[in-house]
Amino acid sequence: MANLKSIKKRIVSVKNTRQITKAMKMVSAAKLRRAQENVVAARPYAGKLAEVLERLAKTQESDASPLMVKRDTRRALLVVVTSDRGLCGGFNANLSKAAERFINERKGEFSELSLMTIGRKGYEFLRNRHTVRKHHGNIFSTLSYQTAALIAAELVEGYLAEDYDEVYVIYNAFKSVMTQDITLEQLLPVTPKAGDDDEVGTEYIYEPSKAALLDELLPKHIEVQVFKSLLESVASEHGARMTAMDSASKNATEMIGKLTLIYNRARQAAITTELMEIISGSESIKG
């Protein structure tokens, strides 16, 4: 009987856990829809801004703005974007390990490679292994463009002060509910991709001037790239958590089935044993 009670208690415990994982899956699904909408809205804006910078860059010198100047690389900063919460599969662990691989592979190129962490999980993983210059936590629950702009301003200020000569960001880009791609991008110095050669002969009129536009658009470009990486990470986090909770719910259902089978077999064996004892007692009385 003691064994039956322990099995039944475990079944109840697993059922309670399944209720929690199902609820978390539903919450993540609702949050994912909103996060996807934000990502879809941000991508075209970021792409068009990059396109304008490409056109400007074709007709400007590489040192037209301090944010485009390529210095002798001595110090670098890596911005690592993870989540504040867990229970999302390998979302945080995989990205933190990718960041560490980047550090180990590239540290020979820099005299100093420091980190800025966004999200508690990455900070906890990396703080005892590498130099964390700055940490931003608890920003995702109330994430806004203003938050991204403040982070971008910190990066630009440090770059202009020559605290570091290159800035990279690593984050999970959202592809689908099941897929998140670890993405590494260079933020500073800004190096717009060269456009199609067919566009070189096209003349554009810029108001008030190309230099004024660069001064205005380059900081905005950094803000948008930081904001997009945060939005991508949020959508990826909810997708990963939704997938993890769905898998956990299915595993719980499977475990409940196995435990129920074990419980029924044990109960049947206990009943059979009791019947045998009754029959044996009855036979001994007759004898």
Swiss-Prot record:
Disulfide bonds: none annotated. GO terms for molecular function: ATP binding; proton-transporting ATP synthase activity, rotational mechanism. It is a peripheral membrane protein. One of its GO terms (cellular component) is proton-transporting ATP synthase complex. Its main location: membrane. InterPro entries: ATP_synth_F1_ATPase_gsu, ATP_synth_F1_gsu. Belongs to the ATPase gamma chain family. F-type ATPases have 2 components, CF(1) - the catalytic core - and CF(0) - the membrane proton channel. CF(1) has five subunits: alpha(3), beta(3), gamma(1), delta(1), epsilon(1). CF(0) has three main subunits: a, b and c. Produces ATP from ADP in the presence of a proton gradient across the membrane. The gamma chain is believed to be important in regulating ATPase activity and the flow of protons through the CF(0) complex. This is ATP synthase gamma chain. It comes from Geobacter sp. (strain M21).
